[in-house]
Amino acid sequence: MMTAESREATGLSPQAAQEKDGIVIVKVEEEDEEDHMWGQDSTLQDTPPPDPEIFRQRFRRFCYQNTFGPREALSRLKELCHQWLRPEINTKEQILELLVLEQFLSILPKELQVWLQEYRPDSGEEAVTLLEDLELDLSGQQVPGQVHGPEMLARGMVPLDPVQESSSFDLHHEATQSHFKHSSRKPRLLQSRALPAAHIPAPPHEGSPRDQAMASALFTADSQAMVKIEDMAVSLILEEWGCQNLARRNLSRDNRQENYGSAFPQGGENRNENEESTSKAETSEDSASRGETTGRSQKEFGEKRDQEGKTGERQQKNPEEKTRKEKRDSGPAIGKDKKTITGERGPREKGKGLGRSFSLSSNFTTPEEVPTGTKSHRCDECGKCFTRSSSLIRHKIIHTGEKPYECSECGKAFSLNSNLVLHQRIHTGEKPHECNECGKAFSHSSNLILHQRIHSGEKPYECNECGKAFSQSSDLTKHQRIHTGEKPYECSECGKAFNRNSYLILHRRIHTREKPYKCTKCGKAFTRSSTLTLHHRIHARERASEYSPASLDAFGAFLKSCV
């Protein structure tokens, strides 16, 4: 009822309002009508939405003299607070974020408040990110004779009057708590937020000398803080994960080779088992270097195993044949004779059945020969031994640095053909690995494995210090540097060290003055893509301001005629 009286009072003619010094009240009524007009504009897409800053300023600038009593003042404050914080849409955490953001902006120097108003951050984290970007941009531009760093920030802080601060907090608390107590509506996702702090002056022109001079006085090159780079961290994690996967694969392959015995076993059953193990090792090596031949190798191995099983059965039925075979294998005749076995085999050659032609010799030198299980191929550089010459050839590429496989599109070279095949998918856009949950496709199977952990929530890598779990081993490695204090990434220019490579990349842009992210509207460049995204809001507000007051009045009249 008090609100109705207030609105009747605000409907006075301009002359009567001037006599009672109520010009502000008439202005508030016009704004209320405008808000009512915006509230009915939920079905039209060409009209910009109302700016939450209008509601925040009304709440902050509301005066007791504009009301006819304390009850009406409290009711009006609740209404304005409800319009600003929008508890029917925002959650408690989001409302708290709005209040903290406003207070954070209010304690900054006015020059920084003006600079931040241009971007209108939605959260305290965005505001901090913008300030850190400004620090990176202006760290090399030091103004002599000025006070720098935290001391300058402390001087720029203008605290609120105690009475004003206390009353403002109480009204905020009472308004929000009252709404949550009596409201039964379930909070929805945040759709819009209140943006800058109270009593922020109008922003100057972009890049004004006054703005740049004050900003450069606040930061120095020695106060370079590490900044999060979300858009670069993803590619970095995938890159490191791929390298670790390759190292783990090579280590596993070497361990398998070492586990197989170097002596050639005697006896039919032991020989069969050793040949099976050696064939598995060969199949693993082939699949690591030539992924496309895995199916063929497994098929050949299965045929060999079936034939060897049949041979073992025949030997058990014929003990004399088995004895003759053992004597032949253990005798010195192999080193003296070399004969080729092809096609039809005699009884002495049964048990050799690989279905291929090969030569019996004391020294095996070709990949097509029967594996012996010995590591006869030794690297002259590091002394590492291999069972096959092809594995030694691939290993020597590590020492020589040879990259014979070159991409025809971009000229990038690789040491293995399988790596070239994976690289060419970047140019062709091929993504053969698809997620069964959401249908998203990837060019590498390793990327699909990482993606599937989003659906499963799997985090197999746990920190021993604090128990925090991660889905990737690279994330765990980065996290553990917080406990150890390790900073392996050092700047070659100034010697400053960082615990993440992404931080070092961002830091180097201070020396190179690189700004790779450029706005297509005005041509302004930035060091990070996230800052460019915030910059786009300036152009969005410019498009919204193109609506003239005359068009808004005509739209309001149209809405009234529809009622």
From Swiss-Prot:
Phosphoserine carried by residues: S13, S208
GO biological process: regulation of transcription by RNA polymerase II
PROSITE patterns: KRAB, SCAN_BOX, ZINC_FINGER_C2H2_1, ZINC_FINGER_C2H2_2
C2H2-type zinc finger segments: 377-399, 405-427, 433-455, 461-483, 489-511, 517-539
Residue span(s) of domain KRAB: 227-300
Region of interest (Disordered), residue spans: 1-51, 257-373
Subcellular localization: Nucleus
Bias type Basic and acidic residues, positions: 270-289, 297-352
Keyword DNA-binding (UniProt): yes
Alphabetized CDD domains for the sequence: KRAB_A-box, SCAN
GO MF terms, alphabetically ordered: DNA-binding transcription factor activity, RNA polymerase II-specific; RNA polymerase II cis-regulatory region sequence-specific DNA binding; zinc ion binding
GO cellular component, one term: nucleus
Sites of the Glycyl lysine isopeptide (Lys-Gly) (interchain with G-Cter in SUMO2) crosslink: K27, K181, K228, K280, K299, K304, K339, K375, K412, K440, K478, K560
Cross-referenced SUPFAM superfamilies: beta-beta-alpha zinc fingers, KRAB domain (Kruppel-associated box), Retrovirus capsid dimerization domain-like
Membrane-spanning ranges: none
Keywords of this entry: DNA-binding, Isopeptide bond, Metal-binding, Nucleus, Phosphoprotein, Repeat, Transcription, Transcription regulation, Ubl conjugation, Zinc, Zinc-finger
Domain SCAN box: 56-138
Task performed by this protein: May be involved in transcriptional regulation.
Family membership: Belongs to the krueppel C2H2-type zinc-finger protein family.
Name of the protein in its database record: Zinc finger protein with KRAB and SCAN domains 1
Organism: Homo sapiens
Gene label: ZKSCAN1
